[in-house]
Amino acid sequence: DLMKFYKACAADGIYASQGGPWYPFFQSQGYSTTGGAPKGGELILYHTQDPKDLEFQYIGEWDAFREYCQEMKDLVDAGAWSSDVLNSSDERQTGLLTGRTASMSWNLGTCLTYGKQANEEHPDWNVTMVDPNKNLSKKVNSYINNGVAINANSKNKERAMMVLNEFYTNPDVYDLAMLGIEGKHWEAVGDDQYKVIDESGYGVASNCNWGWNNCTIQREEYLENRTALDDKYESIKDAFNNNIKEDHVYDGFNFDSSNVSTQFAAVEAAIDNYYNPLINGLVDDVDASIDAMNAAMDSAGIQDILDEMNRQAAEYVAEKEEK
């Protein structure tokens, strides 16, 4: 459906987005980024929807990646986004808010924020939200994502943990960190809701509280004038929460590149020559470009990285099975 939308936008002479939907695509195939892997985890994926599949997938050898890149080239040739997108300094929301693009991909909360801004400034646009992978169960991030770590050299690790527990479990402290000062930045509505008074100087839910999110005590925002977009956001969020996938052991795995630091640095130095043009369809010949990327990655040492990753993953899985 997303591809049909992009093609329809191009046919109508409007840019569909500010680049290719690489994340929604590999997620639609059941895959996720691998923690600690090159290119922010995007170069090596794992099949998060299948807990029995313990193979890592280097995208250069993935047929689906080749097919995706060809489809992106077809979309660019059709005019689905600018051929100059890699040189643009626009932020991700710029295209939507200025009307230069018909969509924006981001997390739920950010899509709500900019969708509401677009509708307030241009009511006739009727911006809405969709989940392009609504049929897939959802991955829940582990606490190593947006979490807070205690330094291994801390002299009082237990005391540090007590502080974090206070932020995580004390409703008053939780409200302060998330919402700011009651009566200045926000006011309570009942026992479990809040209303924004003034976000200047302290953006609600946009600060350190990401490190100890706790939905059991977190207040929901009270909206006096609900919009269709608010309702859509709630329905998608509820659908997410009611469709959590089974854990994959690699959901908590994080690759340590120390033993292959030279190869890792070489891969990172070379990948941008190929990766960004490919995932945005900005190459003349997809097959030739992927072959060139693979040759560069082989020369940089991608196989050494994969071998070390498989070794660490095997140890990680064995350790988990013992517990």
Regions found by a protein language model. Give the residues of each.
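Extracytoplasmic/secretory soluble proteins
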Residues: D1-K323
